[in-house]
Amino acid sequence: MYYLAKEAIDLGHEANTLYLASYQTAGRGRFQRSFYSPQGGIYMTLHLKPNLPYDKLPSYTLLVAGAVYKAIKNLTLIDVDIKWVNDIYLNNHKIGGILTEAMTSVETGLVTDIIIGVGINFTINDFPQELKEKAASLFKTPAPITRNELIIETWRTFFETPAEELLYLYKKQSF
């Protein structure tokens, strides 16, 4: 998803665009680590154009983590945890991650584009041996909600909830 969003930016596509995938063949996390992303997950990247100095940017990773927590809680009453700085956990197992990248204009010094990638193990039934002890899925099939419902609620929450509340939720659920 990241590469698709980067390509769209290079082609001049509009901001506030959400890119979605059913699976990824080369998903990446922090430090370019591989992110297992088969069918049954939610893989999405949001492109924003803040046009702000770096020191004036909101803490996008923290805000999105707060929004993911609140969206899951609103729809399911499940309390997930947030492992500093960008991982979503359920019962001590990683179920998701958030990756944010900023692009800066050399001419203006402003951050022109932000790409926020979110991956959530929604209904993944089987993990590779090396992940079985660390990773889990939010739900077993059948899930009580749809992937679309969680996608919509996550971004509705991100855009409509005051930043102070999302940061509070982030801090409250962090470990």
Predicted regions span which residues?
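N-terminal lobe of the biotin/lipoate ligase/transferase fold
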Residues: M1-I78, G96
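Long, positively charged amphipathic alpha-helical accessory segments at protein N-termini or as interdomain linkers
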Residues: D10, P53, S59-D79, L90-F175
